[in-house]
Curated annotation (Swiss-Prot):
HAMAP family to which the protein is assigned, alphabetical: ATP_synth_epsil_bac
Gene Ontology MF, one: proton-transporting ATP synthase activity, rotational mechanism
Protein family per UniProt: Belongs to the ATPase epsilon chain family.
Gene symbol of the encoding locus: atpC
Membrane topology, from the record: Peripheral membrane protein
Subunit structure, interactors included: F-type ATPases have 2 components, CF(1) - the catalytic core - and CF(0) - the membrane proton channel. CF(1) has five subunits: alpha(3), beta(3), gamma(1), delta(1), epsilon(1). CF(0) has three main subunits: a, b and c.
Protein name per UniProt: ATP synthase epsilon chain
Keywords, sorted A to Z: ATP synthesis, Cell inner membrane, Cell membrane, CF(1), Hydrogen ion transport, Ion transport, Membrane, Transport
Organism: Cellvibrio japonicus (strain Ueda107)
Protein's UniProt keywords contain Membrane: yes
NCBIfam families: ATP_synt_epsi, PRK00571.1-4
InterPro entries, A to Z: ATP_F1_dsu/esu_C_sf, ATP_synth_F1_dsu/esu, ATP_synth_F1_dsu/esu_N, ATP_synth_F1_esu_C, ATPsynth_dsu/esu_N
Assigned GO CC terms: plasma membrane; proton-transporting ATP synthase complex
Length: 141
């Protein structure tokens, strides 16, 4: 039996996941970060995108986070995010629409503040689409 650690994925609204896992993979500023049982303590920011959780027995579940923090202790990992969703609960059409809207706003460039807001919205929509692609790849579609 593989060694496990406790994983909690929490958004500003609620706890999305809590359970024993074999590994958690998230995207940090310097690339993907895999956390397994006994990992050295760590606190790092994470980028918007997928967080993969490999549960006991090897089953995988994918979540979308809008960015946030990853806290690692040797036997516990916590993902703190402003927004966190199960990838299965995401709407691809809404993510594509948000991406198109942000691209349109970037093209207009009404003001510096609007440009920055549109750039953030575009990055979040792209991260949502990456998460949806990851779950489709996992399902073999």
């Amino acid at each position: 039996m593989a060694m496990t650690l406790q994983c909690d994925i929490v958004s500003a609204e609620r706890e999305i996941f809590s359970g024993l896992v074999e590994m958690v993979v998230a995207t940090g500023a310097l690339g993907d970060l895999g956390v397994a049982y006994g990992h050295a303590p760590l606190l790092t920011s994470i980028n918007p995108g997928p967080v993969r959780v490999i549960k006991q027995g090897g089953t995988e579940e994918i979540f979308y986070v809008s960015g946030g923090y990853l806290e690692v202790q040797p036997y516990h990992v916590t993902v703190l995010a402003d927004t966190a969703l199960r990838a299965n609960d995401m709407d691809e059409a809404a993510a594509l629409e948000a991406q198109e809207r942000a691209q349109h706003q970037l093209a207009e460039q009404a003001s510096e503040i609007d440009f920055q807001r549109a750039a953030v919205q575009l990055a979040e929509a792209a991260a949502q689409l990456r998460t949806l692609q990851a779950i489709k790849k996992k399902a073999g579609k």
